[in-house]
Amino acid sequence: MRFMGKNKFHTGPGPSQRQLRVGETIRRALSDVLARGDVHDTDLNRLSVTVGEVRASPDLKIATAYVLPLGGQGKDEVIALLARNKGELRRLVAKKLTLKFAPDLRFQLDETFDRMDETREMLNRAEVKRDTGPVPAGESDTE
């Protein structure tokens, strides 16, 4: 007996190909809506918002958008404005999707750039540079 909801092709811990594809489609649609200013909220339309990633839940009912205001200023304000307008955003994004149900949109701050800065700082430390630098001639780890 087969269960209809089971994904027989995906058994790993990460997202399935469908989740990735739907997330990317939602990201593009949401970016277009925000860039064109289609939302009827002047506060939201005056801000430039970057949608870095959208992760869809396995059942595609929830989509979490990771956003960041251009310049990184007013992060909390952007999340509040997006949450306030999520119904209209959901409707506008759903027009561009070919899914049976429009996913519920949730918004979180995209911290990718902060993590990249931390990684860059770590790689610039003297002890890390020493460990990751070129191996002097005549020395190797395989001896």
Curated annotation (Swiss-Prot):
Chief location of this protein within or outside the cell: cytoplasm
Record's subcellular location: Cytoplasm
InterPro entries listed in its UniProt record: KH_dom-like_a/b, RbfA, RbfA_dom_sf, Ribosome-bd_factorA_CS
Signal sequence bounds: none
Any one of the GO CC terms: cytosol
UniProt KW keywords: Cytoplasm, Ribosome biogenesis
GO biological process, one term: maturation of SSU-rRNA
Molecular function in Gene Ontology: ribosomal small subunit binding
Keyword Magnesium carried by entry: no
Gene3D superfamilies according to UniProt: 3.30.300.20
Bilayer-crossing regions: none
Region (Disordered): 1-20
Stored NCBIfam families: PRK00521.2-5
Assembly with partners or alone: Monomer. Binds 30S ribosomal subunits, but not 50S ribosomal subunits or 70S ribosomes.
Family assignment from sequence similarity: Belongs to the RbfA family.
General function of this protein: One of several proteins that assist in the late maturation steps of the functional core of the 30S ribosomal subunit. Associates with free 30S ribosomal subunits (but not with 30S subunits that are part of 70S ribosomes or polysomes). Required for efficient processing of 16S rRNA. May interact with the 5'-terminal helix region of 16S rRNA.
Protein name per UniProt: Ribosome-binding factor A
